[in-house]
């Protein structure tokens, strides 16, 4: 469950380290985002010479949450932290060329197949 002002780690090599959610996209008064949802973020901490810099406003897709995601069989997949992958504002394709850490099967839609193929592990 990601809401406005939530700090997330970045699970790709775009150059950002920590980001903050500034808007949950999809609905006029939508409060929370879960795994697979697109959010608007601003970069709070970045590495030197990265593809993005501090203060940039981009879109991102949530790939891991502490709250977890419930499966139809009743199991819940939870993670130690909240993480996202940065997306290009126009094409909504990943900015980075590598994904770090596992991602969930819920991302396996037409939109995010690139993230699934780059991820080292799909849970």
From Swiss-Prot:
GO terms for cellular component: cytosolic large ribosomal subunit. It comes from the Bacteria. Keywords: Ribonucleoprotein, Ribosomal protein, RNA-binding, rRNA-binding. Disulfide bonds: none annotated. GO terms for biological process: translation. InterPro entries: Ribosomal_uL14, Ribosomal_uL14_bac-type, Ribosomal_uL14_CS, Ribosomal_uL14_sf. GO terms for molecular function: large ribosomal subunit rRNA binding; structural constituent of ribosome. Signal peptide: none annotated. NCBIfam families: rplN_bact. Belongs to the universal ribosomal protein uL14 family. Binds to 23S rRNA. Forms part of two intersubunit bridges in the 70S ribosome. Part of the 50S ribosomal subunit. Forms a cluster with proteins L3 and L19. In the 70S ribosome, L14 and L19 interact and together make contacts with the 16S rRNA in bridges B5 and B8. This is Large ribosomal subunit protein uL14.
